[in-house]
Amino acid sequence: MVEDGVVYTLDSVDLKHPIKQFPNKEYLKIITDIWLNADPPLVAIPKSRRVLMSWLVSYLHLHLAMFNEGARIYFQSEKEPKSAELLDRVEFIYDHIPQEAMPRWALPKIRRFKKPPKIEFVGLNTTIEGVPEGARQLAQFTATAVLMDEAAFWQMGKESFGALKPTTEGGGRVTVISSANKGWFYDLCYDKQQ
């Protein structure tokens, strides 16, 4: 998937060449393989800045949405505007899929909503929706997948993570990424959960 050359990112630091093809790096292939084959479908990834992890998991969730009818995917961040930024990445990746890889007519059509932040895949009954942290944010929903971004720094990170079990029970995928920080996320990454 990573090596296919269909993913483009936006690098706001490089103003001369801000649109870049996703790099074909071995560690990104390994993370992709782990994500695709995780059983149970829980992946926790400690990251450092500028390793493209947020872009990678945004792409993986976009791929999940584009090719699965009825998927309900949630991007959870500390605040709703931050989850909307992740949806901006998804939309950017979608808008920059090369015609040679998939002609526009073959792509599922999308509709973007700003409040609440959501991308709807028209005709597929599939959505990616942005939500803020909090144990009750997804309580009434069932989810195909939940992405928790920078979760180690949330005030209610552990509670938000703990509340996902009924939301994803039965096979829903949970992806937790964050810059390294001691606490519940560190314990999750290194199997030290109580």
Per-region residue spans from a language model:
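Phosphate/NTP-binding elements of NTP-utilizing enzymes
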Residues: 1-194
